[in-house]
């Protein structure tokens, strides 16, 4: 694995402020056809990541590329991520649009039409289509997340979550809830997690 900063690598723009301009690594499979894989990284004038370009053997192919857009406050407005789809083709697995009230996200929509093919894929699942999918308390702590089935989060005096209640993972059945309890020391170190 190699990281590149001030050097241009596979068409990346050199970065002189500490950002990574590119990464590559070696991969082999049964036919040894993949050789090297990597990413190039692009940033805006505020040093925010705006795009990752996926490469195989030094050639861009967008199979696992990502792009980001931001508002003037630095909040993510959109995120588009490519990957391997259930159909066996490569395409968009996330096409997210974020809506805010102040600087707090209240809704995320996903326009992607197909899910990734691999189990455990880290992509957004748009389980809710509500006007307000995320709520917060007066301190800015998240209270609910409709897309993840989080129905309530209780916080301690340090603003650390002490109880998270969720709908069942099995299609968020209303009659089945899971709860996670957290115990902390006086300085905020998490001591225990209990699942019920």
Predicted regions mapped to residue ranges:
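Acidic/glycine-rich beta-solenoid
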Residues: 1-196
């Amino acid at each position: 694995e190699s990281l590149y900063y001030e050097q241009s690598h596979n068409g990346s723009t050199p970065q002189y402020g500490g950002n990574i301009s590119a990464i590559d690594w070696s991969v082999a499979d049964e036919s040894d056809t993949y050789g090297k894989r990597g990413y190039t990284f692009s940033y805006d004038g505020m040093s925010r990541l705006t795009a990752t370009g996926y490469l195989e053997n030094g050639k861009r192919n967008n199979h696992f590329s990502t792009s980001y857009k931001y508002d003037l406050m630095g909040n993510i407005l959109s995120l588009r991520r490519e990957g391997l789809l259930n159909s066996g083709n490569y395409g968009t697995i996330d096409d997210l649009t974020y809506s805010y009230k102040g600087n707090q996200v209240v809704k995320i929509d996903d326009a992607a039409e197909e899910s990734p093919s691999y189990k455990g894929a880290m992509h957004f699942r748009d389980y809710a289509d509500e006007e307000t999918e995320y709520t917060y308390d007066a301190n800015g702590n998240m209270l609910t997340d409709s897309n993840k089935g989080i129905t309530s989060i209780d916080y301690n005096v340090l603003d650390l979550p002490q109880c998270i209640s969720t709908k069942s993972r099995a299609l968020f059945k209303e009659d089945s809830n899971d709860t996670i309890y957290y115990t902390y020391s006086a300085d905020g170190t998490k001591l225990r997690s209990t699942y019920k």
